[in-house]
Amino acid sequence: MLGLMILLSFLSGTFTGCEKDDSLLVMFWNMENFFDYRDGGEGPSDKDFSSFGKRRWTKRRFHVKCDLASKAVMWVADHYGKMPDIIGLCEVENANVLHKWLDNTLLGKIDYGIVHYDSGDRRGIDVALLYDKSRFGYVHSSVTVPRHDGEAMKTRDILEVCLDRSGKNIHFIVNHHPSKFGGAIRSGPKRQSVMKTLAMICDSISCADRNARIVAMGDFNDNPDGEQFDMLEGILVNQSLALYERGEGTIRFQGKWDLIDMFFVSPSVSICSYMEIVKVPFLMVRDNTYTGFKPFRTYSGPRYIGGVSDHCPIVLIMKMKQ
């Protein structure tokens, strides 16, 4: 039964018109503290996630996570008949982690390019993007540091990567917005500030090219009905609404699903698109407290569990406009 839990959303109608052969497959995943096992002296989180740190994050545990994560990507490839063209990631320590992940798993067989910048985040985690170099040409990339009350925020940068596909540019934007730690009301203004930054980035791209192709993805730490998403109205289309209306989600808290990982696309980017949430058995574990199933995370508090992430990965399938 669990093996059938692939949640479909026909946001552009049906599968018709989004054939696999001519589609773009994008994957996004919050990797839950994807740290190296060495203490590089980059802050308290880096020290905790080391062989002798509080989390006892050993080489073996790191490679278990790498293997399970690559298994998930390969499952996506098998299910859709192709490897993901783009993989957006968040909660990644640094580019070295990504190189190790690619070099030591089956993902190394694909020539993925890595785009990553170190941010000023307090936890020492960043966003990143992988792209299939056989299908895309690198054009440029940049990061924008969100500001709140006139000061740079100690949070994740917003990553924008422009890639060329068949002579046409596509702008991929990767986000990881502030959490609700400390309370939703108290933390809300910071999420609003980051969302405002995202809207400004998209507006700037659109002003330079009114037919700009934009795909934004990320962990937005809010459900699709959050007021902050009104800032993107008229610029990007939320691909997660139908899933959310059916009660689906990417993270489970106290027995309730929240859909905080999403894709947004500009109207000019595709003639059809739909989003799915990946809930295959090896990424899930039984919820003994609230019944049902939940994501198989790496840690529960300080206790090592052995999974990949407390988030389910999401995929976006699009047929591009010519």
Each predicted region: which residue ranges?
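Bacterial Sec-dependent N-terminal signal peptides
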Residues: M1-D22
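N-terminal, active-site-proximal structural segment of metallo-dependent hydrolase catalytic domains
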Residues: F15-T105, V115-S119, I125, K196, ...
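Active-site metal-binding loops of divalent metal-dependent hydrolases
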Residues: M31-F34, V92, H177, G218-F220, ...
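Active-site His/acidic residue clusters
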Residues: E42-S45, K168, F172-S187
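Second-shell loop/turn segments in exported
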Residues: F52-F62, M83-L89, H116-Y117, R147-D149, ...
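Structured beta-strand-rich core segments of catalytic domains in phosphoester-bond hydrolases
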Residues: I86, V92-H171, H177
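Active-site environment of divalent metal-dependent phosphoester hydrolases
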Residues: N94-N96, R122-G124, K180-G182, N221-E227, ...
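Metal-dependent phosphoester-hydrolase catalytic domains
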Residues: M200-I214, N221-Q322
